A protein has these predicted regions:
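Conserved N-terminal phosphate-binding loop of PLP-dependent enzymes in the Aspartate aminotransferase
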Residues: 1-457
């Protein structure tokens, strides 16, 4: 089918996520045709370096025949198996075991979902069940962080703190609370790490006391705030927050949907600070985006409370496609690839990526470069001293994304003029160098725009 026919069919029928429906109708879809390694090809034959791994998820890179073969073998042998009725499949059982073996601390129990949003949703249900089983049903208040992202399901989007996910949906709910982001570049206390940690601890204490310590169920945090603009907290921040939650007896949920599976270097970002959460959510890199799957990791003590609380009764939470054998078979092969060289390559490529992006720091539009491993951001400003963001009237996200695309690069351009990077771990030196060169070209072209020049005057 010709690309223009697909464009019309898309315009008429396919609803795209987090998009202006009328805006998309006017623009039309860009049809992707194929991909290999870190390169994608569109329907016109244009090749682009995927600097964002799809949607932070194709960590292993595109076109691994061994992943395709693992899926095909499982489809031929057992394409579906429910995990209801005490049934199971070998891939799902082995995957749960392999993940538990590699998870921080005593996160020895794994519940499989279809992705990140329903993984977060599942934790909310499990947290509520936990506190009811402990005889503390009043603990029904949840805290997360401004500019955080915890999915786009009804309750998860309420924990998310991005306006686009709230407008028109009647969320967040009254039981969902926020504290300020540790955002070093734009923090009221400045960029000193110790001051930021102290401010966050103070804010969390105030919020807990305001709600009532006996009423707070759980606190949610990403090791790096992804969709909020790749905000990297100072070293020690997450560990300090986790310890405060422990002091108050509040469950701590680490959302590693983006950071998990080598994105920041190790398999899980929590291990960089020896953090053992009560729950950990993952998805994206779990299957490298080849098939849908997410996972909730649950600590022993949480599992025991839930299991003992239910006794002979069923814990009434489940999905038709939980522990899907094909997804599990894919995840097992992806995990093998990570440990057979991709994690190491990602660490090397991440160092090259950060060095390359830091080389752009002298560009007139670059206010800050930040990141860890293969997860990074460049924040654009019109005044470096005042940290003035690009004017909203310039539509920086749309403009920069389109321009990068024309230059053969896919990145995430956030509305506030932040460029997000999350390339596949398989990137070669030439892939990384192309990302940097095409970013610089995109910045130079944007600097030449009359309205941007005027804003900088």
């Amino acid at each position: 089918m010709l690309a223009n026919s697909l464009i019309e069919l898309d315009r008429a029928h396919l609803i795209h996520p987090v998009s202006s429906y009328r805006g998309h109708e006017a623009l039309g879809v860009r049809v992707l045709k194929s991909a290999k390694g870190a390169t994608v090809t569109d329907a016109s034959g244009k090749q682009l370096v995927d600097g964002f791994a799809g949607l932070w998820c194709v960590n292993a890179g595109y076109g691994h025949d061994s992943i395709v073969e693992a899926a095909a073998r499982q489809m031929r042998e057992l394409p579906y198996a429910t995990a209801y009725f005490d049934l199971g499949s070998e891939p799902a059982i082995r995957l749960a075991s392999e993940l538990a073996e590699r998870a921080p601390g005593d996160l020895n129990h794994v519940y499989f979902t279809l992705g990140g949003s329903d993984a977060v949703d599942s934790t909310i249900r499990f947290v509520r069940y936990y506190w009811n089983a402990k005889g503390e049903p009043q603990r029904d208040q949840f805290i997360s962080i401004e500019q955080g992202y915890h999915g786009s399901s009804v309750v998860g989007a309420g924990l998310t703190a991005l306006p686009a996910f709230h407008a028109g949906f009647g969320i967040p709910f009254e039981w969902q609370h926020k504290i300020p982001s540790p955002y070093p570049y734009r923090n009221p206390v400045g960029e000193d790490g110790n001051a930021i940690i102290a401010a966050s601890l103070a804010a969390l204490k105030i919020k807990i006391e305001e709600i009532g310590p006996e009423c707070v169920a759980a606190f949610y945090a990403e090791p790096i705030q992804g969709s909020g603009g790749v905000i990297v907290p100072p070293k020690g921040w997450m560990k300090a927050i986790r310890e405060l939650c422990r002091e108050y007896g509040i469950l701590f949920v680490a959302d590693e949907v983006i950071t998990g599976f080598g994105r920041t270097g190790p398999l899980f970002a929590c291990t960089e600070e020896d953090i053992v959460p009560d729950f950990m959510t993952t998805a994206k890199g779990l299957t490298s985006g080849y098939v849908p799957m997410g996972a909730v990791f649950m600590a022993d003590h949480v599992y025991d409370v839930i299991a003992d609380g239910a006794g002979a009764s069923a814990v009434g939470h489940g999905y038709t496609y939980s522990a899907h054998p094909v997804s599990a078979a894919v995840a097992l092969e992806v995990l093998r690839l990570y440990e057979n060289g991709l994690l190491e390559n990602g660490i090397r490529a991440g160092a090259r990526l950060m060095a390359g992006l830091n080389s752009l720091s002298d560009h007139p539009l670059v206010g800050e470069v930040r990141g860890r491993g293969m997860l990074a951001a460049v924040e654009l400003v019109t005044d470096k001293q005042k940290k003035t963001p690009l004017p909203a009237s310039a539509m920086p996200a749309r403009r920069v994304f389109d321009r990068a695309w024309d230059n053969g690069l896919i990145i995430r351009a956030f509305a506030q003029g932040v460029l997000g990077y999350a390339p596949p771990l398989c990137c070669t030196d030439s892939d990384i160098d192309a990302i940097i060169e095409r970013t610089r070209r995109t910045l130079d072209q944007t600097l030449d725009d009359p309205d941007v020049r005027q804003a900088m005057a």
